[in-house]
Each structure stands twice: as structure tokens, then as C-alpha cells.
Amino acid sequence: MSKLLERLLGRLPVGWLQLTHSRTRFAAAVAGVAFANLLVFMQLGIMGAMSTTTLAPYNFLDADIMISAEDANTLTDGSNVARARLFQAMTVAGVESGAPLFVGILEFKLPDWTNSTLQTFATEVADRDFLSAEIAAQFSRLTQENTALIDTKTRGVDASVFADLKDGKPFAFEVNGQTLTAIGTLELGGGFSADGTLFVSDQTFLRFFGKRSSGAPNHVLLKVADGVSPQVVAERLRSILPAASVQVNTLAEYKAADLAYQSLERPTGIIFGFGVLIGIIVGIVIVYQVLSTDVADHLKEYATFKAMGYEHRFFLGIVLEEAGILAVFGFIPGFIVSMGLYAGLSAVTSLPVYMDGTRPFMVFF
């Protein structure tokens, strides 16, 4: 290692020699930096899972613009929207078609009497073009009463439960004291607000949510004509719809706003962000403590170098050399351990906790 550093630096690797002079102290310093790296990796991993699960449901929607209640921050919260807003929107130039979107939470009761929560989406069967190709291909079958498409990756549910369903056989289960029959599947998995996802027709949705009305969906989905800018149409809609009761966004804008709300305003996102900050501070404190102690221990040697005519940048180079060595040697075990913890956490929680391509660079630099 000394020879390699000597070639890279073009001089004797004084910083490396000083750090490794006491192997016990060096190992403790590396362990501290590795822990700080691990802490940041884990917080970023969980934040990444939150971002992924927040945006994933939007992949099942195929729309350009969404009209929501003024107080809605996510797909699942906020007041309902009067269906009349859909009819108003259809009169605006550039709007080609529209559909209501109903959203709710149902509890899936398993044979062992445990429950899993299902984030439930619904629209009219005739409006399946507003859904992704995967869902739309199966959605026409939901004209049958009390039928659904169920998430086979629902958290807390053994995959064997859906074995018959994957073979083309219907799967009946209990929801809110009623029987619902799954006749198709989708794959998403659990998130922070629900254990899985369910798609039903609007009529089935209204049967299971007795207090909901067909005249008050959660959102209104719109498609614009070919060659027309969704942003331009959204501005036209904002000019005629009451801002006090509804908000109009392109689907991309609403996704970005939803993610920002989850990350910056909800307690979960704030806690994870604070954890990243703490990890960075811990790393800075550990490295500073190691470097300051090492400098203090070698003041006599530095004084000798100074008397020999070495400039200030020489000493700065030694300190930066030590900082770089600690960063590299602490990063490697932190990265390896975090990969193992990611896999374990993902297996236990069914959250999409994984290492993306940019995260190692974010943490290291």
C-alpha cells in the first residue's frame, strides 16, 4: 500500500504511515467512519424505498392531467371532487376524454384471521384506457359483480395463497365482511401506506365503500388531444375551475408534488432526512477527531519538517491524504454491510430497499 500511495502522491505517504503506525487506533477510526457511512446508506435506502412506493401507483395510470381537491397532497388523502368538474373540463379546448378515479383502503382478511391493507383504485370499466396496458388488458373482466385484480406481492400474504389465481382460477377472499373475488393479478408490493394494491370497477368500489357516491370521485383523470400540450390545457382548466375547491396539475406535476410532500412535510420523510444529516455529522466529527488527534501527536515531527523548509501546503497535503484514506477505508465496509442490510430489510418489510447506481457516489463524495 505504501508503494502504491508513493507512486500516486509522488512522495513518501506520510499520512498513511502516521495512520497505520497504531493499527488499533486506525481500525477504530475506520470502524467509526464505516458506521457513519452505514447510517447514511440505510437512511438513503429507506428514503429511496419511500420514493419508489410513493410513485409506483402512478405507473398504473395513463393520463395527462389530474384534477384533485384543493386539500389533496397525495393520491389517497384530501376531499372528494364533484363529478361536475369532469363535465366542465370536457368543454375546454384540448381535452379529449376524462374519467373519475376512486381511491380507498380495504382490509384483506386472511384465513388465519390476520389482516393486510389494500390500497384500492377504481374507475368505470369503459374508462380502462386511463389505466396502464397491464391493468387495462384485464379490466374489462371486472364487469362481473364484486370482482377485482389483486396484488400478488401483498405484504404479509404468502405467495401460495395466490397459486390457484396464477393458474387462472378465481380467488375469493373477505373484505369488510363481504366476499370479493380476484380474477386477475398485478404486482406492486407493500409501501408505507398499505400492504398491497387492488383494482376494482367503480360499481364494486361503491358497494364496498357504502358512504361514497359516484358523483364524488377522489380525482378526475384527463387526456389531451394529440399534439396539444398538457401544460397549456392545465392552464385553461385553472382559469375556469374554482381554485378554492380544486387543483389542476399535469400527472408529472402531481407526482413531483406528492413526492415532495412525502419527503419534506410528512413526519416519516423528515425523520429519514434528519437521519441522513445525523450520519453526515457523525462522519465529520469522527474524521475531525482522528485527524486532530493525529496532528497533535506528531507536532514535533511537523515542527522539524517546518524547520527544514517545507511549505504549508505540504502539511495540508498530509491531512488531506489521511482524510482520503479514512474515507476510502471506511466507505468499503460501510457499503458492503449496507448491501446485506438492504437485502435483509427488503425481505422482512417487502419494501423496495435496494442500492441504486448513484447512491454510492452520493455517499462517498
Cite the ranges covered by each PLM segment:
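N-terminal Sec/SRP start-transfer signal
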Residues: 1-40, 51, 56, 320
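Residue-level signature of transmembrane alpha-helical entry/exit and packing/kink sites
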Residues: 25, 355, 359-363
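Alpha-helical transmembrane segments of integral membrane proteins
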Residues: 29-39, 269-289, 323-330, 334, ...
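Hydrophobic, regular-secondary-structure patches
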Residues: 34, 38-118, 138-144, 235-239, ...
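Peri-transmembrane interface segments
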Residues: 54, 236-285, 293-298, 304-305, ...
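Basic-flanked hydrophobic alpha-helices used for secretion and membrane insertion
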Residues: 130-133, 150-249
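Transmembrane alpha-helical interface segments in multi-pass membrane proteins
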Residues: 292, 300-346, 350, 361-362
